[in-house]
Design a protein with these regions (language model features):
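Bacterial N-terminal signal peptides that target proteins for export
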Residues: 1-8
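Repetitive helical segments and hydrophobic/amphipathic motifs
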Residues: 11-12
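N-terminal signal peptide c-region/cleavage motif recognized by signal peptidases
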Residues: 15-19
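Conserved "boundary/linchpin" sites in short secondary-structure elements
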Residues: 23-32, 39-51, 71-85, 98-108, ...
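Acidic, negatively charged sequence signal
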Residues: 56-58
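Short, small/polar residue-rich loop motifs at catalytic or cofactor-binding pockets
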Residues: 60-67
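A short acidic/small-residue loop/turn micro-motif
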Residues: 84-92
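Short, hydrophobic/π-rich interface segment
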Residues: 91-94, 99
Length: 140
């Protein structure tokens, strides 16, 4: 149990900004595998886009479902975003999700894995608000 808990907890490390002497907060994931990392990645996306999260249970039919494979380097920088399943009726959603992931970089650094690839399912409502399958509140 301790190992599982440690794998999903994230620690904060203060890093000096180059040449400025200022301090920047950088999040590090202690996940030991891609499955455990999903929660850290999802929490980071939720924190980055808090105003765009769909609150409560999603409607029975969501507007779009996007399945994404994200590859990160050891520092949490996004190396690639591969769309595994895309909504053909809503290509704008696909591009928006891709751009949101890139702009959220760096994600928590997967230091125990030296980089990772993980999958996430984005559930997008007609309003444009979303939930990630990892942290979804379910559907009505």
């Amino acid at each position: 149990m301790k190992h599982l808990l440690a794998a999903t907890l994230a620690t904060f490390v203060l890093l000096s900004a180059a040449g400025a002497g200022a301090q920047t907060l950088h999040k590090t994931s202690l996940a030991a595998d891609a499955k455990a990392y999903r929660k850290d990645g999802a929490r980071h996306i939720y924190a980055t886009y808090a105003d765009q999260i769909y609150k409560g249970k999603l409607p029975p039919l969501v507007h779009a479902i996007v399945v994404v494979e994200t590859e990160l380097d050891s520092g949490g920088n996004v190396r690639s975003v591969n769309m595994i399943r895309v909504p053909t009726h809503a290509p704008d959603v696909t591009e928006r999700v891709r751009e949101m992931i890139r702009k959220a970089s760096p994600l928590p650094a997967p230091t125990r894995m030296g980089g990772t690839r993980y999958f996430e399912v984005w559930l997008v409502d007609k309003s444009g608000r979303f939930q990630l399958d990892t942290l979804t509140e379910g559907q009505r």
